[in-house]
Amino acid sequence: MAHVKNHDYQILPPSIWPFFGAIGAFVMLTGAVAWMKGITFFGLPVEGPWMFLIGLVGVLYVMFGWWADVVNEGETGEHTPVVRIGLQYGFILFIMSEVMFFVAWFWAFIKNALYPMGPDSPIKDGVWPPEGIVTFDPWHLPLINTLILLLSGVAVTWAHHAFVLEGDRKTTINGLIVAVILGVCFTGLQAYEYSHAAFGLADTVYAGAFYMATGFHGAHVIIGTIFLFVCLIRLLKGQMTQKQHVGFEAAAWYWHFVDVVWLFLFVVIYIWGR
């Protein structure tokens, strides 16, 4: 009788993923700092990208392993209606925490734009962007990326409505394919933009704020594209139903969050920040 389940909640077994995820994130972030600052740790030559890439591979491994466990839990009936509501609330809180990350980047950019010499400086006049910084024309590549990301959001909404309201797997799969392709295109164009930038990460406070804000968003686009791709594979395998598709719903929420953040980036950094 000890193994009889008489409640709607999920009792999780011990998992290795939080521990290894923390290690991967620590190595990745430490490697990123070492790479950007060109420093060494205990005499080890980690100033290149290798430590960062090792941590990134570890984080991706944990991501897919953890997702696989969650998928298996859903297929074995562990995700009751109560559990699904908890997963949805948890993901909403996760997105709220991500919002605060971007608030910090926007705060840094706007504060330095309004007070280039610092809020406590007796010199009130300053130049923004700093002298020597050649900014991007927002009406060329940034505008194209904006349209691409908005179209991908439309594709995700189209796919979600087709699946939830009509149960149309074919339309849902087509919509997700379009969204994933557009997500990859956005990332490629962002990389192209970076490669042709007239300033580097360490050039000025403008450059640092620009790359941190847009780069952090770019990382979210990559994660969101992977998220949508996983949903696409699961749909092709028949692992989602109209009643049980929490993963798909979370991916759609995440992608729309990425869309909204980019609109703010486009207006604040590319247009107003010029």
UniProtKB/Swiss-Prot annotation:
* Annotated InterPro entries: Cyt_c/ubiquinol_Oxase_su3, Cyt_c_oxase_su3_dom, Cyt_c_oxidase-like_su3, Cyt_c_oxidase_su3-like_sf, Cyt_c_oxidase_su3_a-hlx
**Membrane topology annotation:** Multi-pass membrane protein
Q: Where in the cell is it found?
A: Cell inner membrane
GO process annotations (BP): aerobic electron transport chain
Any one cellular-component term (Gene Ontology): plasma membrane
What PROSITE patterns would the database entry show? Answer: COX3
Q: Which Gene3D superfamilies match?
A: 1.10.287.70, Cytochrome c oxidase, subunit III, four-helix bundle (1.20.120.80)
Would the keyword DNA damage be found if you checked this record's keyword annotation? no
Known catalytic reactions: 4 Fe(II)-[cytochrome c] + O2 + 8 H(+)(in) = 4 Fe(III)-[cytochrome c] + 2 H2O + 4 H(+)(out)
Q: What class of enzyme is it?
A: translocase
Signal peptide (UniProt feature, chain positions): none
Alphabetically sorted, this entry's keywords are:
Cell inner membrane, Cell membrane, Membrane, Translocase, Transmembrane, Transmembrane helix
The record's CDD domains line, in alphabetical order, gives: Cyt_c_Oxidase_III (cd01665)
Query: In this UniProt entry, which residues form the Cytoplasmic topological domain(s)?
Result: 2-15, 78-79, 167-168, 238-244
Taken from the record's topology, the Periplasmic segments are 37-48, 116-139, 198-203
Locate the transmembrane regions by residue number: 16-36, 49-77, 80-115, 140-166, 169-197, 204-237, 245-274
Protein EC: 7.1.1.9
| GO terms of molecular function | cytochrome-c oxidase activity
Q: Which family does it belong to?
A: Belongs to the cytochrome c oxidase subunit 3 family.
Protein name in UniProt: Cytochrome c oxidase subunit 3
> Which species is the source of this protein?
Paracoccus denitrificans
Its gene? ctaE
